[in-house]
A protein has these predicted regions:
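Alpha-helical bundle segments that constitute or directly flank the non-heme di-iron/ferroxidase center
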Residues: 25-36, 45-82, 99-100, 148-156
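A short small-residue
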Residues: 40-45, 80, 137-140
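Acidic, low-complexity proline/glycine-rich segments
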Residues: 2-5, 11-41
Length: 156
């Protein structure tokens, strides 16, 4: 992907982005809705998940939450200041957002504690292998893909 990335308007307005980025968002919309509209999240919101299911979710999700700043650091290593305006934007955003992401591990630990999950249990990761798939995919994407693809894979 060699198209220059230049945002031309507000951050949260899709029309501010290059056509290839707009196409990416449009082509992913069905998949995005399938995830955000998944019954798991509605049941979680409504307090309808069993304690056992919540514990598995919290333990299985820990890997991604704890390592997310590391995925982002892989992408940061791909940037160099002044190579392109888009790369400069990505570099600045990554540096700022890594700091924000660091807090999420603390929040996750507190949430897990509310369900009786200890930090030792989070670290042990004794959950079904399927709960590790997202973490492996994020790590692989950021370690092997070019900047634009890796950032799209983990930050959209």
């Amino acid at each position: 992907m060699n198209d220059t990335f230049v945002r031309s308007g507000p951050l949260k307005e899709l029309s501010s982005y290059p056509h290839w980025a707009q196409r990416l968002v449009q082509e992913c919309e069905t998949s995005r809705l399938a995830v955000v509209g998944h019954p798991l999240y509605a049941r979680m919101r409504d307090g309808q998940l069993s304690r056992q299911t919540m514990r598995a979710f919290l333990i299985g999700g820990w890997q991604v939450v704890e390592q997310f700043p590391l995925y982002m650091s892989h992408n940061l290593l791909k940037t160099r200041f002044g190579r392109s305006p888009g790369e400069d934007m990505a570099r600045r955003w990554l540096m700022r957002n890594i700091r924000v992401e660091l807090n999420h591990a603390d929040y996750w630990v507190r949430w897990a504690e509310a369900y009786g999950v200890t930090l030792a249990e989070l670290k042990a990761q004794l959950v079904p292998a399927e709960l590790h798939a997202l973490g492996h995919w994020c790590w692989h994407s950021c370690a092997t893909e070019e900047l634009a693809l890796a950032m799209a894979a983990t930050n959209y």
